[in-house]
Amino acid sequence: GEGAVYDIEEFVDSVAKIYHTPPPALKQDKLAFMAATADAQLLNYVAWPQATLHGGRGGKVIGFMMPKVSGKEPIHMIYSPAHRRQSYPHCAWDFLLYVARNIASSFATVHEHGHVVGDVNQNSFMVGRDSKVVLIDSDSFQINANGTLHLCEVGVSHFTPPELQTLSSFVGFERTENHDNFGLALLIFHVLFGGRHPYSGVPLISDAGNALETDIAHFRYAYASDNQRRGLKPPPRSIPLSMLPGDVEAMFQQAFTESGVATGRPTAKAWVAALDLLRQQLKKCTVSAMHVYPAHLTDCPWCALDNQGVIYFIDLGEEVITTSGDFVLAKVWAMVMASVAPPALQLPLPDHFQPTGRPLPLGLLRREYIILIEIALSALSLLLCGLQAEPRYIILVPVLSAIWIIGSLTSKAYKAEIQQRREAFNRAKMDYDHLVS
């Protein structure tokens, strides 16, 4: 990135972003204006500059202080079913609805101050377990400094509205709130529909579904009421749009089709109001407390998806029925995947061992030495007998026999010691192999 973020010992609730190289003069003016206009409302929803940092007194702006964002994760950890089941297993759809509402509120706060987010993408929104949303990377926002526009000149194609898909660059281009409102609607759709993209689905015409950017540019909203004409339909076993009340369905239709360009997309304030109202119109399924859905529906949509093997929410506290008629493999597997894995086993490293050698017992010679001594004494005795041929050398016969007997006994003791050590080594090796297998 263009800079690095550091903790500040004296201000534990703030961090400092320091640029690798001092930004241009216009960017310095932008940061100075943002720091001077910070207020409680902005700081509640945005990691907004609180003070500029300079290389010296009266020197160039080299960075800024901003609120520290802790205890929060990127928003995709919430709307991705797999990640949510792992990290937030007790969060049902009403939690997601509140997150979506808070996303809209963060946009509304920025817009009320005359600014535009510009580079809307999933990595710029952090969410906590209390559903609170904080926008980061605010120094890239399009800022209106008392009539002077500091443009946002970056963007992500998958969050770029259809009317801007043909732009080769955002350099010198002025964004509007209506452009932001496209990205806002897309984020809300992601959160409420399990991470699905509204322009991704099953192709109905030959050139649809090849590139997401192309489908966005052609307004191929897969969940539209006229999606047959547009060329895409929703993926199989996905959350149906009919889960939402008709007025919220219409808001998505307005946001993702041509009418949103012509007459404007739903504003952030409109989304806050609509989602707050929807939050008051929820009910729980009688089968699972985790199945929360809008009250206008007769049947539970989550149960219907469960029966298709698509598990969005897991009731970890329910009684598991194991009869063949009520067993759903996907549900059991989802519960398995939601469990927290034990920490990785810390294997002992060979370098950490400091073995100490154990010498042979006293008086126990190695077998090779015993054999050499026996051979040498035998050869000497035979030589003397052959040369002298005297009877007195006959006494060497029992001496040689004694040497052989002692050598044999010593050799057996040596073999037993070696066998004992070999067995100890094999046991240690088996224990180690079992540990690492």
Residues covered by each model-derived region:
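The N-lobe alphaC helix and its flanking beta3-alphaC-beta4 segment of protein kinase-like domains
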Residues: 20-48
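Activation segment/activation loop of eukaryotic-type protein kinase catalytic domains
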Residues: 123-165
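Conserved end of the kinase activation segment
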Residues: 164-178
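Conserved C-lobe activation region of Hanks-type protein kinase-like domains
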Residues: 176-179, 188-249
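ATP-binding glycine-rich phosphate-binding loop
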Residues: 1-25, 43-44
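C-terminal or otherwise distal, non-catalytic regulatory regions appended to signaling enzyme catalytic cores
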Residues: 287-294, 298-437
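Conserved structural core of kinase catalytic domains
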Residues: 46-99
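Catalytic-loop of the protein kinase fold
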Residues: 107, 111-130
